[in-house]
Regions:
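Primarily membrane-embedded glycan-assembly and transfer machineries that use lipid-linked glycans
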Residues: 1-179, 201-334, 397-398, 425-430
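Hydrophobic alpha-helical transmembrane segments of integral membrane proteins
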Residues: 89, 143, 187, 193, ...
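Membrane-embedded alpha-helical segments of multi-pass membrane proteins
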Residues: 109-114, 159-164, 190-194, 339-343, ...
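Membrane-embedded alpha-helical segments of transport systems
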Residues: 113-114, 189-192, 219-223, 368, ...
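Transmembrane-embedded, aromatic-rich helix segments that form part
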Residues: 180-184, 192-204, 212-214, 339-340
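Central hydrophobic cores of alpha-helical transmembrane segments
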Residues: 182-186, 212-219, 319-323, 359-371
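Hydrophobic/aromatic-rich transmembrane helices and adjacent perimembrane loops
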Residues: 333-349
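Aromatic-enriched
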Residues: 350-430
Length: 430
């Protein structure tokens, strides 16, 4: 219990409390301002809309006008964000609140409530009430995950989406309609997190869940596009440009040395670029590694014996491997690694049984680097010249130490696939 208390204090101090001190500018302000622009018939992806609809109860940053005029706002600051139009429909309840500060505090309160709901659901579906020691360990580990701390401090939409994703997975068997609606919301806000989950449900042939989810998503999309069409807003070109610029040279999504914050990314290209030194080769290598792991996952998935009543532990292992692999090929920031709650749950479940315990312990060791924002910390130490030049320029520092979180994800994916293979062998032999 003491471990949980310490982890909870760390979570509150490094998460919600930090957010309360950064209300003037954070990751949530741009999506809300863009939603206000959408509601008023303006282009939500146009930098000028940010200045026009910026909340009056907070100070507008000085860089907003200067970077907007110079055309570097997206490259330098990542705003306007390239969230899909469906996100504006879902964020409308916060955008219609006149006071930004009230909306922001309600947002962080809702995210905290969803996080707590996810913790309770983990205990219920994982039957941790019968294995309290493992349940306490899991609770402390989830509270200690640095991606959640970073996400809460920034007000990132990811910290709302990941608990929704977990609840959708937990309820997929017994509450298909609820799970489908939650999945649609996840895709509407962050497609790169929601689509792998929908793909998993499709492979499980949960057709009712799939159709309900796609129907809800279609309704949300129609509302979003119709509002833009009624006002004759030429949004599509700016949306495409925002996505292009976000991943372009020198942007916050750039995985090369042109982005001084690149080690805050966790996609595989950060690592492959350090190794090969060429953007095109890094992209090809990153996609190839993720593709190979994805094919291995599919092979093991279809080799898994079919069961009418799927075992929660095996389902958690399977979806854990899928989510870890999904983090590798495309743009993901550090807080998206909050998806590591899935392998954390499985690892704590695996500790109960001797045959799986080894894989579970190795998985916990590989998740350990994510209890601190290591890449960002090392990046700041290097930038502040706290790391000797001889060390900072050495191959082992650049290839192993700086991208250590990506190495951990790669190895974790391999361990989870190995655990899937071991489970399949055990089931087939019995």
């Amino acid at each position: 219990m003491m471990l949980i208390l310490l982890a909870a204090v760390e979570f509150i101090v490094r998460g919600p409390l930090r957010f309360s001190r950064s209300l003037d500018f954070n990751d949530f302000v741009s999506p809300v301002v863009q939603t206000r622009a959408w509601l008023n018939g303006a282009d939500p992806y146009e930098p000028a809309s940010l200045m026009q609809f910026w909340p009056s109860d907070i100070q507008r940053p000085d860089f907003l006008r200067s970077d907007s005029v110079s055309g570097t706002l997206i490259v330098k600051r990542g705003i306007p964000t390239a969230y899909p139009p469906t996100s504006f429909v879902l964020l409308t309840p916060f955008a219609v609140i006149p006071s930004w500060r009230v909306a922001a505090l309600l947002w962080i309160g809702l995210c905290t409530a969803m996080f707590a709901g996810m913790l309770f659901a983990m205990w219920r579906f994982g039957d941790f009430a019968s294995h309290t020691n493992h349940g306490y360990l899991l609770t402390a580990l989830v509270l200690g995950l640095a991606p959640f701390h970073t996400g809460f401090a920034a007000g990132s939409i990811a910290i709302f989406v990941v608990p929704l994703c977990a609840l959708a997975f937990f309820w997929a068997q017994n509450q298909e309609v609820v799970s489908a609606i939650l999945t649609a919301v996840v895709i509407g806000l962050k497609p790169q997190i929601g689509i792998p989950l929908l793909f998993y449900f499709g492979l499980r042939k949960q057709w009712k869940l799939i159709w309900v989810s796609l129907s809800v998503l279609a309704v949300i999309a129609v509302v979003a596009i119709t509002r833009l069409a009624i006002s004759h807003t030429p949004w599509l070109s700016n949306y495409a440009m925002d996505n292009t610029v976000l991943l372009g040279q020198g942007s916050l999504g750039d995985f090369t040395e042109l982005n001084p914050l690149r080690f805050g990314l966790i996609n595989c290209q950060v690592l492959t670029y350090v190794i090969f030194g060429k953007r095109c080769v890094a992209n090809l290598a990153g996609f190839s590694v993720a593709g190979f792991l994805g094919l291995a996952w599919l092979y093991l998935f279809f080799r898994t014996p079919v069961s009418r009543s799927p075992e929660f532990k095996m389902e958690t292992l399977t979806v854990s491997a899928l989510f870890v692999i999904s983090l590798l090929p495309v743009y993901h920031r550090f807080y998206d690694a909050s998806l590591l709650i899935f392998p954390l749950i499985w690892a704590c479940l695996a500790l109960r049984n001797f045959p799986e315990r080894r894989h579970g312990i190795i998985a916990l060791v590989l998740i350990a680097p994510f209890f601190i924002p290591g890449g960002t910390v090392l990046q700041q130490l290097t930038a502040n010249q706290r790391i000797p030049v001889s060390i900072g320029q050495s191959w082992w520092w650049r290839v192993i130490i700086m991208p250590h979180e990506i190495w951990a994800l790669l190895l974790l994916a391999v361990v989870l696939l190995s655990a899937m293979h071991a489970n399949i062998k055990m089931k087939l032999s019995s």
